[in-house]
Design a protein with these regions (language model features):
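Terminal peptide-recognition signature
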Residues: 4, 60, 78, 157, ...
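Solvent-exposed loop/turn segments at secondary-structure junctions
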Residues: 10-13, 48-51, 75-77, 129-133, ...
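C-terminal soluble interaction/assembly domains
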Residues: 180, 190-226, 230-239
Length: 239
């Protein structure tokens, strides 16, 4: 899209050495480099119907960025509608964005998830495909290079595949449809909801839908997801 700046999820939001989210300082530098200030409005979009765009959205919110928005419909939809395209690489004056300390209320870690299995006021939402959830496959066909060695799901998790939330063109279903879908599976706003997937990107998509479209007050993304859970000896697994 003309004027868009590349923000590479592998380079700019993941610490490849630790396989963890980047530090506050690294995010500050990355966003300053592309001209971002604290009062900038960020609009994110990407491929795979915005998997990684919502992952970036979650990271930005984790470090306190105020005005982040998701384009409804991914890059593919933009192409298909014959909208303006560019090969130019824009340059911007370095920005002055300053990140906040991490907002730990939107992130879940493995030990916390393990402790909360079976809790009546919390619910785990596995947003992977049904075959991943049941242990028939270890990773999605779209992104199969990182996965847990063991198949299955976290005990007690309900399966709501991320693609049940979107139409074929990548646009999101209505809030009415989404509310009906989640409440039919007992994923209700009175509970703390923890989302997870394979490596964190699809979990961020569902986190975005629940928190920002449906207004659930307490939603966390377990970004370690199955890559961490399914590679850790002794973790409980169901199929």
């Amino acid at each position: 899209i003309p004027g868009a700046v590349l923000f590479d999820w592998k380079r700019d939001i993941i610490d490849s050495t630790k396989r963890d989210v980047i530090s506050k300082q690294v995010l500050e530098d990355s966003l300053q480099r592309i001209g971002v200030n604290n009062d900038t409005t960020l609009i994110v979009y990407g491929d795979f119907k915005n998997w990684f765009a919502t992952f970036a959205f979650w990271i930005f919110k984790y470090y306190g960025f105020k005005d982040v928005r998701l384009m409804n419909g991914s890059r593919k939809k933009w192409f298909e509608e014959d909208r303006p395209l560019s090969l130019d690489i824009p340059s911007y004056t370095r920005g002055n964005f300053k990140a906040s300390d991490p907002d730990k209320s939107i992130r879940a870690f493995m030990n916390y998830v393990k402790e909360e299995i079976g809790s009546q006021d919390k619910i785990l939402v596995d947003v992977r495909t049904n075959d991943e959830y049941n242990g028939k496959t270890l990773a999605p066909t779209e992104y199969s290079t990182e996965y847990g060695q063991m198949g299955g799901h976290i005990p007690g998790a309900v399966n709501v595949p991320w693609n049940t939330m979107v139409y074929e063109d990548g646009t999101l279903k209505s809030a009415v449809e989404l509310k009906k879908l989640y409440e039919s599976l007992n994923v209700t706003p009175d509970k703390e909801v923890i989302t997870y997937c394979g490596i964190g990107e699809r979990a961020a998509y569902t986190w975005f839908v629940l928190k920002y479209l449906l207004g659930y007050p307490n939603v966390k993304s377990y970004d370690g997801s199955w890559l961490e859970w399914g590679n850790t000896i002794g973790n409980p697994i169901e199929k």
